[in-house]
A protein has these predicted regions:
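Active-site nucleophile-His-acid catalytic modules used for acyl/amide transfer and hydrolysis
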Residues: 260-274
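Acidic, metal/ion-coordinating pockets
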Residues: 1-264
């Protein structure tokens, strides 16, 4: 089975900059990846509702409208999702045509946040993939997350990854918003097969023979779909899962913007210009 995982995060401005990035190019890549391989997972690892000039007016609705044209399989709220308060995030979550999730965010009393999911298990061509969505635990210090409670990013992520493996996941994928120091701890845990991480505003890939890792750039400038060729065999009732990663590099300067998305972008630009 060939599985493709495309991750993105830290995308704030609807328009491109110097012919690179922006939602119209991002959506073009997402649509093309899905068309090329039905076993594609498209994940968001945090930060889009703010900050941008237009978000100052619409509290991030423009980013929801644009991502709804090429919806994610799962979206993790970043700290900037709470810049306009919890109520606004709840409204934007309800307006999304994709699921938001984070295993380490609860209400003040520890009960689940309505509409916010947890670990997601997907069957991709017979491969059981567990998506572990984890938010940045420093969010309350830098954003307006009200009385929401954020459990420790690293410990919660590793515990959930190990549990997913025990529950029979063939592949464990972390979708996290956290800094590179925490990323290194997640990689060192050997609990994840793949980690898609945002927050650092940089682009990086690595593979240590156990975990394939992508730091998912900023503003959708550079994208790295990861293709995993997965071989599953069963012997004496035991499942053996083997895979190798192929990191592709896409400089979005070479991508033709998605027409539907570009029309929406042009409309938003006109609003700003007026």
């Amino acid at each position: 089975v060939k599985l493709t995982i495309l991750g993105i995060g830290d995308i704030y401005n609807f328009q491109e900059e110097k012919g690179r990035g922006g939602f119209a190019r991002l959506n073009a890549v997402a649509k093309a990846e899905r068309a090329a391989n039905p076993n594609t997972l498209y994940v968001f690892d945090g930060d889009m509702l703010s900050p941008s000039i237009l978000s100052g007016f619409d509290k991030g609705q423009n980013t929801i409208d644009l991502t709804n044209l090429a919806p994610f399989d799962i979206a993790v709220p970043g700290n900037h999702e709470f810049d306009f308060g919890v109520e606004n995030f709840m409204e934007k979550m309800a307006a999304s045509k994709f699921p938001w999730a984070a295993i380490n965010i609860t209400k003040a009393d520890g009960t689940p946040v309505e509409g916010l999911g947890g670990v997601m298990v997907k069957d991709m061509g017979g491969v059981k993939v567990a998506l572990i969505p984890v938010a940045q635990d420093t969010t309350p210090e830098v954003s307006s997350s009200g009385d929401l409670k954020f459990l420790p990013t690293v410990e919660t992520a590793i515990a959930a990854a190990k549990q997913a493996r025990d529950d029979g996941a063939d592949l464990v994928v972390g979708v996290v918003q956290t800094n590179m120091d925490n990323d290194r701890m997640l990689i060192a845990s050997k609990a994840f097969d793949v980690i898609m991480s945002g927050d650092d505003h940089s682009y990086a890939t690595s593979y240590d023979g156990i975990t394939a890792y992508v730091e998912t750039s900023i503003e959708g400038r550079y994208l790295s779909p990861v293709d995993l060729v997965i071989d599953i065999s069963e012997k004496d009732g035991k499942r053996s899962v083997k895979w190798t990663p192929n990191f592709r590099f896409i400089d979005t300067a070479s991508v033709t913007p998605d027409a539907e998305s570009q029309a929406m972008v042009d409309g938003f630009q006109k609003k700003l210009d007026d």
